[in-house]
Swiss-Prot record:
Annotated family: Belongs to the LpxC family.
This protein's UniProt keywords: Hydrolase, Lipid A biosynthesis, Lipid biosynthesis, Lipid metabolism, Metal-binding, Zinc
Keyword Metal-binding belongs to the record: yes
Listed EC numbers: 3.5.1.108
Cofactor(s) in the UniProt record: Zn(2+)
Gene Ontology CC: one annotated term: membrane
Alphabetized Gene3D superfamilies for the sequence: lpxc deacetylase, domain 1, lpxc deacetylase, domain 2
Pathway(s) it belongs to: Glycolipid biosynthesis; lipid IV(A) biosynthesis; lipid IV(A) from (3R)-3-hydroxytetradecanoyl-[acyl-carrier-protein] and UDP-N-acetyl-alpha-D-glucosamine: step 2/6
GO molecular function terms noted in the UniProt entry: metal ion binding; UDP-3-O-acyl-N-acetylglucosamine deacetylase activity
InterPro entries in the record: Ribosomal_Su5_D2-typ_SF, UDP-acyl_GlcNac_deAcase, UDP-acyl_GlcNac_deAcase_C, UDP-acyl_N-AcGlcN_deAcase_N
Active site residues of this protein: H266 (proton donor)
Protein name: UDP-3-O-acyl-N-acetylglucosamine deacetylase
Length: 307
């Protein structure tokens, strides 16, 4: 299977979830083996240079997965666009933006999916590299855990737990094996969510200024405040899977393995990536030059053409 990039550059404007400021974002094609990179067009000099993404650049996970370089450059809320790039198997792309965070759009990855469909996807000459999990690796932290286990494909299983009546009406666990299920159909539409009392507290600290009922599920004392309700009966846990897929794709390659999590979040997801990369016996890099050898979970990537 070959590496791929965008067929053409494409842009979109939106609002930053935390800043509330308008953000112009452009995705560009990039050369093979260059990976996913970001560039802040609103900054000059070294701060305006291109940054190649890797798990060690995620140094702020309090509210999202945020790049923070040693020079203090920030690019926040990257998980939704990374999730969409993962769904289309984009290996190489340059993402330019004129603000410190990716626009929130509608709170899901679906607008970025549409953007990729409009841009189109092209194969490149180099073989796509996969990160294959060879043994179980687990991170436990303050009542939550995540783990990788070997698996001939890509499967994600997550469980959430919140002490709130809304969550008692929603299944807490969701599992998706991409050998038989579609990311676009099952995951892409799931929106980020938050509690009304948290929104008020965040705004008091100049955070969440761009959040509203058009780009997040807002939960009141007893119910969801969005008049249209939920897009899936279990939209909450599906969004956590959307986030996890984006967080894991920060490694820059598709993962051959199973990911499980209980009350997972950006911090433990990133810690798990780092733990795998720190143990050379836990993984290997593989290629599938013969499509017959490609695990079923990636067959949809092999035939999908956005153009």
């Amino acid at each position: 299977m070959l590496q791929r990039t965008l067929a053409k550059s494409i842009g979109v404007t939106g609002v930053g979830l935390h800043s509330g400021e308008r953000v112009a974002l452009t995705l560009h094609p990039a050369p093979e083996n260059s990976g996913i990179s970001f560039r802040r067009t609103d900054l000059d000099g070294e701060m305006g240079e291109q940054i190649k993404l890797n798990p060690y650049l995620i140094n702020d996970t309090r509210l999202s997965s945020t790049i923070v370089t040693d020079k203090g450059l920030r690019v926040g809320t990257i998980e939704h666009i990374m999730s969409a790039l993962s769904a289309y198997g984009i290996d190489n792309a340059l993402i330019e933006l004129n603000a410190p965070e990716i626009p929130i759009m509608d709170g899901s990855s679906l607008p970025f999916i549409y953007l990729l469909q409009d841009a189109g996807v092209v194969d490149q000459k180099a073989q796509k590299r996969f990160l294959k999990i060879l043994k179980p690796v687990e991170i436990k932290e303050a009542g939550k855990w995540v783990r990788f286990t070997p698996y001939d494909g890509f499967k994600v299983t997550l469980t959430i737990e919140f002490d709130h009546p809304v969550f008692n009406r929603s299944p807490p666990t969701f599992e998706i094996d991409f050998a038989g299920k579609s990311y676009i159909g099952e995951i892409a539409r799931a929106r980020t969510f938050g509690f009304m009392h948290e929104v008020e507290m965040m705004r008091a600290h100049n955070l969440g200024l761009g959040g509203n009922l058009n780009n997040a599920i807002v939960i009141g004392d007893t119910d969801v405040l969005n008049p249209e309700g939920l897009r899936y009966p279990d939209e909450f846990v599906r969004h956590k899977i959307l986030d996890a897929i984006g967080d894991l794709y920060i490694v820059g390659h598709p993962i051959v393995g199973a990911f499980e999590g209980y009350k997972s979040g950006h911090a433990v997801n990133n810690a798990l990536l780092r733990a795998v990369l720190a143990d050379e016996t836990a993984y290997e890099w593989v290629e599938f030059a013969d499509s017959d050898d490609l695990p079923d979970a990636f067959h949809e990537l092999n035939i999908r053409n956005c153009g």
